[in-house]
Amino acid sequence: MGFQENKMPEVKRQRPGTMRLVDATQYRLPLAGVVSILHRASGAMMFALLPLVIWLFDTSVTSEISFEVFRSAFGAGIGWVPGWFVKLAVLGLIWAYLHHFIAGVRHLWMDATHSVTKEFGRQSAVVTLVLSVLFTVALGAKLFGLY
């Protein structure tokens, strides 16, 4: 009894609750967090589109005629979807692949070298974003026929 009575009352601290999606705009993520979320989003996007990409690849290599139909989609479009929108969608898929690949290399590098500091995380996040955008612009210029 003596020990229990002398115990100080615990102070209840207000703990943060679970973050809801609608509250996401109130938080300011560091750049490394933004790159991490984009890495996950690009991976999810590629996973969701994988059946379509496999079907398109299979269709394009079936015959020369099917390849020409596939190729004409970039110029004339598909049904009511204009060709520039098809190119824009493909450009989004190109960005997703490049960003996911570069961010994956970043994560592997950090795991292999134990470079887990706030400064390295910020610097490597900047490099990841810059490289993925530069490579996407270069491939997008080729996709839209600029060179």
Language model region names:
Residues 1-147:
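Membrane-embedded alpha-helical bundles that constitute the cytochrome b-like, heme-associated redox core
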